[in-house]
């Protein structure tokens, strides 16, 4: 696999997201999923729907999310839909909670630590994906961005428990009693991300926004305020 060419701009605007996407030279085909973080209730740092409107309109995408595996405002479809409305996502976009009905299994025959991934069943409805990530810290992964979006983010509630425990359980109630060492968790994220990336067979693009960067993830209801200056926007393809 060739090294990915990564584009960078210091400009962090609605327009710069479109410009850097177009620099990639790809047109995402068919039904386009836009994977982003809807933001936990109480979190102040997630990317706002107004900020990403131009790029989502540009790719004619559907915002996709999956339910969480821990207590909060996003661990059931009913609560997650209310959160999406309160954060304004469905004011501007079609929004699909991909595991609202069920999940499906993706095999990872060459996985390093896990051999399968449980993802929202609606993933099969999409031909392409734009992974639109907010770069920030993460308590288990070190930082949360594209890798976390593809792995934890696309995983169903059961899949999130499976990745966090490196395959020990799909039961969210048993998740916190079965946490692995950090390196194994990161390897499990990489395995899960790889199978989702490969599913789209090149019809996938990545944009990472480095603004409002906190040590805490957007999944934290009580997050630290940003602790460093904004940096810019990254975009890349991995074929």
Predicted regions mapped to residue ranges:
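Extended, low-polarity segments enriched in aliphatic/aromatic residues
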Residues: 2-53, 58-239
């Amino acid at each position: 696999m060739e090294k990915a060419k990564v584009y960078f701009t210091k400009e962090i605007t609605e327009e710069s997201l479109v410009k850097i996407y177009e620099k990639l030279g790809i047109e995402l085909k068919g039904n386009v999923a836009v994977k982003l973080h809807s933001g936990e209730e109480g979190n102040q740092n997630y990317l706002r729907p107004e900020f990403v409107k131009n790029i989502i309109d540009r790719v004619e995408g559907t915002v996709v999310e999956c339910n969480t595996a821990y207590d909060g405002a996003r661990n059931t479809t009913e609560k997650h839909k209310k959160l999406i409305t309160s954060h304004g996502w469905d004011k501007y976009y079609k929004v699909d909670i991909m595991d609202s009905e069920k999940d499906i299994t993706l095999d990872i025959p060459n996985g390093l630590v896990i051999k399968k991934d449980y993802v929202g069943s609606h993933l099969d409805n999409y031909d392409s994906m734009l992974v639109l990530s907010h770069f920030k810290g993460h308590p288990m992964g070190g930082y949360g961005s594209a890798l976390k979006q593809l792995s934890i983010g696309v995983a169903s509630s059961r899949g999130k428990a499976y990745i966090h425990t490196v395959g020990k359980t799909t039961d969210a109630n048993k998740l916190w009693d079965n946490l692995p060492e950090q390196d194994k968790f990161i390897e499990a994220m990489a395995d899960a991300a790889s199978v989702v990336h490969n599913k789209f067979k090149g019809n996938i693009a990545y944009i990472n926004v480095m603004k409002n960067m906190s040590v805490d993830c957007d999944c934290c209801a009580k997050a630290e305020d940003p602790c460093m200056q904004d940096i810019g926007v990254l975009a890349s393809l991995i074929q």
